[in-house]
Amino acid sequence: MKRKTAEVKGEKERNSKQISLEEDKIKGMFNPKIWDKTFQDGLKKEIEDSQPYNWGTIHELVNDDLLRAVRKEIETEIHFTKKETDIYRVNQSGDLANLSGLDWDDLSRLPNLFKLRQILYSKQYRDFFGYVTKAGKLSGSKTDMSINTYTKGCHLLTHDDVIGSRRISFILYLPDPDRKWKSHYGGGLRLFPSILPNVPHSDPSAKLVPQFNQIAFFKVLPGFSFHDVEEVKVDKHRLSIQGWYHIPQVGEEGYIPGEEEAWVRNNTSTLAQIESNVLEDFEFPKDERNILSFHEVKHFEKMLKGDAGAKTDNTPKESMTSVISDSVKLSEAEFTYLSQYISPEHLSSKGIEKLQKQFVENSSLQIESFLNDDKSELLKKVIKQKELEQECPYHSKDVKAPWKTAIPPHKARYLYIDGKEYRNFQTEADILEALNNNDLPNFQFTKDAIKIISDASGNSRENNFDAELALIDLAVFHKSTIFKKYLALLTSLCPVSEQILIRRFRPGMDFTLATKCRFNELLKSNPDIIDAVLEGTLCLTPSAGWESGELGGYELYMMDDDEDNKQYLKEDVEDASVYRADDSGDSVLINDPPAWNTFNLVLRDESVLEFVKYVSWSAKSSRWDVKMKWDVKSCDEDGQEDEA
């Protein structure tokens, strides 16, 4: 009996010793400092006090030889493919997009990478991480890592990492171990404060310049943990391993029944926020179109129905001549007015007939040399002058009237003029004031205000508003009843509402993410209103070199396949974020790079997504355009128009 007891005791001692040796081996692969209680408490305090939310970083995290070996394995054994969507451009490993999907029985190619994965998800390290971040217990069975390399032009736009059961996000950096990664290279991790929950500020308040063997991490905070990866600006590659720690799973220490389900149910991903109306109150400019007057709409209806000459009992015997003709052809006065801006070939009967045919066939138009030579040359001159002589503001607080900054930045960021009162959204109070005092667009008022500012500041280069004034004149032209009649002629659709924005997308800064069109709730009860939005984009970008797409800035329309996207969302949890726009090209309907003097017209229904791709730091100028949207009704008694 004693002998058997001694054998059992000896076996326990051997197992305990083996576990202890294994634990020592794991700890030995990390920097010894992280196991020191004083270091842990100091790091915990740093994280608690950090801004804009709780985050931390550790230099020289793991054994240097191990990480160098991992880097060598990745560079020699893994093939990377460039992937691009509306939110990112990055090089991902084709066979190792998610390390948890690897067949770990075959370790011959990547033994050191496997070892790194083991220690990062070891109980010892998870307990350390859970302690310093105050995240509690973390799952060791639900591993979630991906390998990315950021080369010149690569970027990842603002998001909060809220997907599924993620509890902590981390990035382990592996750039060249023998050279310092400098701030001007780009590729930094930038953290954004929040004006309100789910409404990040336009500008980051913290930036980490990554170095070899450095880890950055933060607790995933729905509505607050917004961050991005700055575009890499030089011909160097910034290798990194992105990963997440998840809520404990069934059978693991710290597992709480129903915790994960409640977390997923109560916390909305960035993508879901963009698609829903949850952000609607906090979006500026709002996707709202102002309803046109009865006076305007009646002319378009008469023209499209072909009853311009019809008389009613209320028709005066001596009818007055209207400034706006109801004829299906342009009057001499209308032709003269439109000729101030539009090229003559697009105003002739033959030119209009050609455009009408194209729109009927495609539900879209692309018109080159839309503006006449005089207006085109004037606009190019003042826009180039603006680019060359005036420094463009890159911080939202520095953006002055008449420009505003689009928010929130996990949906869009660009400069715009909307004909409304000047706003600069820095605080919750700024947003609430705008919501409480909503005004209608008045570009003439904006123009008058600019002249007052210009006169008060003098005619210096820094206060030259020639570009703004010329663009506002263009917006006034597009708002005119005669231009909308021309639009109705081209499309056989009757405009009933409108929105016009002058936009500037700055290099290294601006974009819009893919969204569906929103219909005007006030018009839903009208059965003649088409379930689509007519969108026009007059692109006025003065620089060249956009055709390849490498500089971004292109406007892209693509099909939104719900079933494909459900599968995409399911499969893509390994990516740093999840967004609909794929890079296969199969669903792309229209891809228009920035150009000079091109007018694109698209009838878009809710099955079509649209975005303007992030403009690269390498672009020679901003992307400039005038964006127009109209709700439209059909005057065809046989039925509605077909949408693209």
From Swiss-Prot:
Protein keywords: Dioxygenase, Iron, Metal-binding, Nucleus, Oxidoreductase, Phosphoprotein, Vitamin C
Cofactor detail note: Binds 1 Fe(2+) ion per subunit.
Swiss-Prot/TrEMBL catalytic activity: [ribosomal protein uS12]-L-proline + 2-oxoglutarate + O2 = [ribosomal protein uS12]-(3S)-3-hydroxy-L-proline + succinate + CO2; [ribosomal protein uS12]-(3S)-3-hydroxy-L-proline + 2-oxoglutarate + O2 = [ribosomal protein uS12]-(3S)-3,4-dihydroxy-L-proline + succinate + CO2
Protein name (record): Prolyl 3,4-dihydroxylase TPA1
Domain Fe2OG dioxygenase per the UniProt entry, residue ranges: 141-247
Family stated for the protein in its record: Belongs to the TPA1 family.
One Gene Ontology term of the molecular function aspect: peptidyl-proline dioxygenase activity
Knockout or disruption consequences: Decrease of translation termination efficacy and an increase in mRNAs half-lives and longer mRNA poly(A) tails.
UniProt record, GO biological process: nuclear-transcribed mRNA catabolic process, deadenylation-dependent decay; peptidyl-proline di-hydroxylation; regulation of translational fidelity; regulation of translational termination; translational termination
The UniProt record lists the keyword Metal-binding: yes
CC annotations in GO: cytoplasm; nucleus
Origin: domain of life: Eukaryota
Function: Prolyl 3,4-dihydroxylase that catalyzes 3,4-dihydroxylation of 'Pro-64' of small ribosomal subunit uS12 (RPS23A and RPS23B), thereby regulating protein translation termination efficiency. Part of a messenger ribonucleoprotein (mRNP) complex at the 3'-UTR of mRNAs. It associates specifically with components of the translation termination complex and is involved in both translation termination and in regulation of normal mRNA decay through translation termination-coupled poly(A) shortening.
Miscellaneous section: Present with 8910 molecules/cell in log phase SD medium.
Residues that, per the record, bind Fe cation: H159, D161, H227
EC number: 1.14.11.-
Cofactor requirements of the protein: Fe(2+); L-ascorbate
Quaternary state and interactors: Monomer and homodimer. Interacts with FRK1, eRF1 (SUP1), eRF3 (SUP35) and polyadenylate-binding protein PAB1. Interacts with ETT1.
Gene that produces this protein: TPA1
Cited InterPro entries: Oxoglu/Fe-dep_dioxygenase_dom, Oxoglutarate/Fe-dep_Oase_C, Pro_4_hyd_alph, TPA1/Ofd1_C, TPA1/OFD1_N, uS12_prolyl_hydroxylase
Keyword Lyase on entry: no
Localization annotation: Nucleus
Residues noted as binding 2-oxoglutarate in the record, renumbered to the chain: Y173, R238
Predominant location category: nucleus
Modification type Phosphoserine: residues: S607
